[in-house]
């Protein structure tokens, strides 16, 4: 039997359908409120509002659970590779061996970008932030694929593959241009993560040998950042896509949203905070500053809009961080890691943080791993964009396949 919630306005009762979720909280359907009750609902930041139906990602913030298509994030990080997870998000099931091989071949085939795109890079000054370059380059792909300006359902799969394939190439080109080095072409026999590291760190005169520990760590980071429900950048992609905008334009809007320091730029802020603290002996001082409502200092890397428990991605990254630093001989002498571990231990025992359910999030350890890999801080958000493109494309595809999809129009 159908269930309803009752809303009483000016003495009149309105019955609102309660929609049953396959997992998690049920939802009150308020879509007819404005038409029937002559008023709107008000929810700044969409704190209590579901904007769409989705079967891609599930989060239980109170229990610290994150699942993609029913698979726990910790299992995917430990047992899968990034393109396998990409296939899962886009198609809804893990691939068979044959499906995986075909998918990876298609991604490799589409990793090159049009040579004319090189001229676009030359219009930027050498000090340009790689995210600025990447945002423009991804948007410009619309000019190279005019057939997708009026895309059809048959284009969804190829579009997703093209985007996943070209984003790491553009990301590496953005980095190379920012440091004045020649672009490095993809090397298709390498897997997805190896190929990106090759394009980042090889030069025409120097071959880059990929450290397997670093490759595996980056693979995990990409998996952990692949999708996360209707966050700011994903919602931006969906809103842009709801107008029928071409997919390259939609992804560029996601990149713009991700660039914000409250979203994709948070791990860089964690590194800056750890450097500011400087030594473990100063941690109590900064804990006190974080508690002082009159002090502008914020403890970066703690707390999350959704999680009121330990972010499951942070738990994986903490161990990954130790593995990488141990392999690189930095485990016992990396000052940032030592400060981070002690800061976490102190904060998790402090009543102020316990009462407010402030736990380490995915940004707390990822920046330390990137720094150990030799990836500069201005590239942190770029790497986030590489991973999240998979989620953006899965969400974009799901939105266009939804028969109830409408153009987004907040009131």
Curated annotation (Swiss-Prot):
SUPFAM superfamilies: Citrate synthase. It is an enzyme of class 2 (transferase). It catalyses: oxaloacetate + acetyl-CoA + H2O = citrate + CoA + H(+). Citrate synthase is found in nearly all cells capable of oxidative metabolism. GO terms for biological process: tricarboxylic acid cycle. GO terms for cellular component: cytoplasm. GO terms for molecular function: citrate (Si)-synthase activity. Belongs to the citrate synthase family. Its EC number is 2.3.3.16. PROSITE patterns: CITRATE_SYNTHASE. Keywords: Transferase, Tricarboxylic acid cycle. It comes from Rickettsia conorii subsp. caspia (strain A-167) (Astrakhan rickettsia). Pfam families: Citrate_synt (PF00285). Pathway: Carbohydrate metabolism; tricarboxylic acid cycle; isocitrate from oxaloacetate: step 1/2. The active site is at residues 304, 363. Disulfide bonds: none annotated. This is Citrate synthase.
């Amino acid at each position: 039997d159908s269930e309803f919630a009752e809303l009483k306005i000016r003495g009149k009762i309105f019955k609102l359908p309660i929609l049953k979720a396959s997992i998690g909280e049920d939802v009150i359907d308020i879509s007819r409120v404005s038409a029937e009750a002559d008023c709107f609902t008000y929810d700044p930041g969409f704190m209590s509002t579901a904007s769409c139906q989705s079967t891609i990602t599930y989060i239980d913030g109170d229990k610290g659970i994150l699942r993609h298509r029913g698979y726990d994030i910790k299992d995917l990080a430990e047992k899968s590779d990034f393109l396998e997870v990409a296939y899962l998000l886009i198609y809804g099931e893990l691939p068979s061996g044959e499906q995986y091989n075909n998918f990876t071949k298609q991604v490799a085939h589409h990793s090159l970008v049009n040579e004319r795109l090189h001229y676009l890079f030359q219009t930027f000054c050498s000090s340009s932030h790689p995210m600025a370059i990447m945002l423009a380059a991804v948007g410009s792909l619309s000019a190279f694929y005019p057939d997708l300006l009026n895309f059809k359902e048959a284009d969804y799969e190829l579009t997703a593959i093209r985007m996943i394939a070209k984003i790491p190439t553009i990301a590496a080109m953005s980095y190379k241009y920012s440091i004045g080095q020649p672009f490095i072409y993809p090397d298709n026999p390498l897997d997805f993560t190896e190929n990106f590291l090759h394009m980042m760190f090889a030069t025409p005169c120097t071959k880059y040998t990929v450290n397997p520990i670093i490759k595996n760590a980056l693979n995990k980071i990409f998996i952990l950042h692949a999708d996360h429900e209707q966050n700011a950048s994903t919602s931006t992609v969906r809103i842009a896509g709801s107008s029928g905008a071409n997919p390259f334009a939609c992804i560029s809007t996601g990149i713009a949203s991700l660039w914000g320091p409250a979203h994709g730029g948070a791990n860089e802020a964690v590194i800056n905070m750890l450097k500011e603290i400087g030594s473990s002996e100063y941690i109590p001082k900064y804990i006190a500053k974080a508690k002082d409502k009159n002090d502008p200092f914020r403890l970066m890397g703690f707390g999350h809009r959704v999680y009121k428990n330990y972010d499951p991605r942070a738990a994986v990254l903490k161990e990954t961080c130790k593995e990488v630093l141990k392999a690189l001989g930095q485990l016992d002498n990396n000052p940032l890691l030592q400060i981070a571990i002690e800061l976490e231990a102190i904060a998790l025992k402090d009543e102020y943080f316990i009462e407010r359910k402030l736990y380490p999030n995915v940004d707390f350890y990822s920046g330390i791993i990137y720094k150990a890999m030799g990836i500069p801080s201005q590239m942190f958000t770029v790497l986030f964009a590489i991973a999240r493109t998979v989620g953006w494309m899965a969400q974009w595809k799901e939105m266009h396949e939804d028969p109830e999809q409408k153009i987004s129009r907040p009131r």
